[in-house]
């Protein structure tokens, strides 16, 4: 399974008149039909040269990304996040599922679901590692609460065991 990266696409932080149509026009100018693909997406905020992910989602909706990302409860999440970070630029990254051949946008909701679910969970874990305040409430139980000595989670008090040190080195690049 293959995914491509598109963006970042800047959002109108005031959600002024016709902000949705302006956003979609920008997306479609970048890549025709991108707004109707099945994919994962990340809402992020940029301040200077630093960008942090704040919300990770996925869509396999028949209306594609366009029918999913700006549902009212998600816009409310974005507004809450932006209210706490008023000087940051809001953006969205898109990660559409691609076909294995010819690198076209995949329309296979059934066969793509597992890959999209996996990518969303992986992106949430990655986002959580750089921003513990992400707005996602699902799929964060294990990344927040599982500890594997030397590999995952906050170290308990005391020295790492030799096995923990070896495990830590094993997963470092």
Predicted regions and their residues:
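Boundary/linker segments flanking structured domains
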Residues: 1-54, 60-173
